[in-house]
A protein has these predicted regions:
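Short alpha-helical DNA-recognition segment
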Residues: 19-37
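DNA major-groove recognition helix of helix-turn-helix/homeodomain DNA-binding modules
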Residues: 49-64
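TPR-repeat structural position
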Residues: 89, 129, 168, 206-207, ...
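Amphipathic alpha-helical segments of tetratricopeptide repeats
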Residues: 96-104, 136-144, 176-183, 214-225, ...
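Alpha-solenoid helical repeat architecture
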Residues: 70, 107-113, 146-153, 185-195, ...
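Tandem amphipathic alpha-helical repeat scaffolds
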Residues: 75-86, 113-126, 152-167, 190-204, ...
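A short, Lys/Arg-rich alpha-helix, primarily the initiator
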Residues: 1-17
């Protein structure tokens, strides 16, 4: 929002913020304290020479004081934002020092907030989350004069930070608020819609996720070889898979793989193969699952996603009842992820699925795994889908053993989870 302060009020606030006395300013401009008081109250005139001395004395030579300077500053601010948005950090960093003089003006809350929020995006893109979080924590003190653009950037940044912390519901709330604050300068883009779609997926709401991911594809020209296009396609296909739309998911997964290979992005290609393996396992096409899994293992050999590909290999071996090799793969996986608290439950789960006839394993799956994965904020999100799969597995197991009472108990839990996924909403805490 535009500051309505007079010139005198502005220099008074600057003086007070810098801890300068009226007498000191009077000496600098070769006048009296009374004149300075009148100047600050708008009762005295100043010329260009005096203005230049005041600027130099306060260290605000390059700070925008007047309307034309402020408009020029805003224009450069949005150029800076565009550089950051386009990942052109070299030019963004070059502009940053030229825009920082706004921080010398204690009354320019909105422009300072805008500067901080664009700077926060730079911190995040550089991986400096501590600095970004510190900036966000100071932002609320500037909200009294915040413009729609500033609020958009604040909520976008806060949503991203909380997404990285896996605080999904609050993250979603901020991203949705960022959409509510779109303007001509800051509009929603495919990245925001991807994040919203991803969080809905993590929270076990695949169809809400599909709505935003499809919107990202139709509303924006992403470019057929862009990383963002590949990310959106992979997320979209994953949602279709968990929604039971296997044919749609398979087409998109294969397209994602082709796109990734076209730009020699083995990690993206491998990620597509990991999820395609899951799809083939769900369809019962074990041969295709093995082929996709082997491709994923080759592509992801030096990446953290390799653990997921290895887990899929164990699932494939369970389906072919090759329990001896499956045991070796599980042992390898446990050793690989022993220091990663987010991945260790994956191989613990598989080890119990591989020994389903053991009462200790069924007890683990019922009383530990299902409650654990039903929590939407575990295992990188999306755990609720895993909980539903475990219910289906246990129900089939108990029916095979003719333990109908247990089968019915598990079926009830499975139906409740199904209702959560396909008919429940997201409840935000105040």
């Amino acid at each position: 929002m535009k500051s309505n302060l007079s010139f005198g009020e502005k220099i008074k606030q600057i003086r007070i913020a810098k801890g300068i006395k009226q007498e000191e300013l009077a000496k600098a401009i070769n006048t009296s304290r009374v004149f300075v008081s009148r100047l600050e109250n708008g009762d005295a005139r100043y010329d260009d020479r005096m203005l230049a001395i005041i600027r130099e004395f306060y260290g605000i030579e390059h700070s925008p004081l007047f309307d034309d300077e402020i408009e020029d500053y805003k224009s450069r601010l949005w150029v800076w934002n565009d550089f950051v948005h386009e990942n052109n950090l070299r030019d963004a960093k070059a502009m940053q020092d030229k825009l920082s003089p706004i921080l010398q003006l204690p009354y320019e809350h909105d422009l300072t907030l805008l500067y901080f929020m664009i700077e926060t995006r730079i911190f995040f893109k550089e991986g400096n989350f501590a600095a970004g979080e510190e900036r966000l924590n100071t932002a609320e003190a500037l909200f009294d004069e915040a413009s729609t653009e500033a609020l958009h950037l604040y909520h976008r940044n806060m949503g991203f930070l909380l997404l990285m912390k896996r605080i999904y519901k609050t993250s979603l709330k901020h991203f949705l608020l960022s959409l509510d604050n779109e303007t001509i300068n800051v509009k929603p883009d495919a990245g925001i819609l991807l994040n919203i779609g991803s969080i809905y997926y993590y929270l076990g709401k695949p169809w809400q996720a599909v709505i935003h991911l499809e919107q990202a594809k139709t509303k924006f020209d992403l470019g057929r070889t862009s990383v963002l296009e590949s990310q959106i396609n992979t997320a979209l296909a994953t949602c279709y898979m968990f929604a039971g739309e296997y044919d749609k998911a398979e087409v998109i997964f294969n397209d994602s793989y082709i796109q990734a290979k076209r730009v020699s992005n083995d990690i993206r290609a491998g990620a597509a193969m990991v999820t395609l393996t899951n799809l083939y396992l769900k369809k019962g096409d074990i041969k295709a699952a093995f082929e996709a899994c082997n491709q994923a293992l080759t592509l992801l050999e030096n990446d953290t996603l390799y653990a997921y590909a290895l887990a899929n290999k164990a699932y494939c071996l369970i389906e072919t009842k090759d329990f001896a090799q499956c045991k070796e793969v599980i042992s390898q996986g446990k050793e690989m992820v022993k220091d990663n608290k987010n991945l260790t439950p994956i191989f613990e789960l598989i080890s119990h699925i591989a020994t389903l006839d053991n009462p200790e394993s069924t007890n683990y799956l019922e009383n530990t795994a299902i409650p654990h994965y039903r929590n939407a904020d575990v295992n990188d999100g999306g755990g609720i889908y895993q909980a539903l799969d475990i219910c289906k597995l246990l129900e089939a197991h108990y029916r095979k053993k003719r333990n109908m009472r247990k089968a019915k108990d598990i079926a009830v839990i499975g139906r409740d989870i199904y209702k959560e996924i396909f008919f429940g909403g997201v409840e935000f805490t105040p």
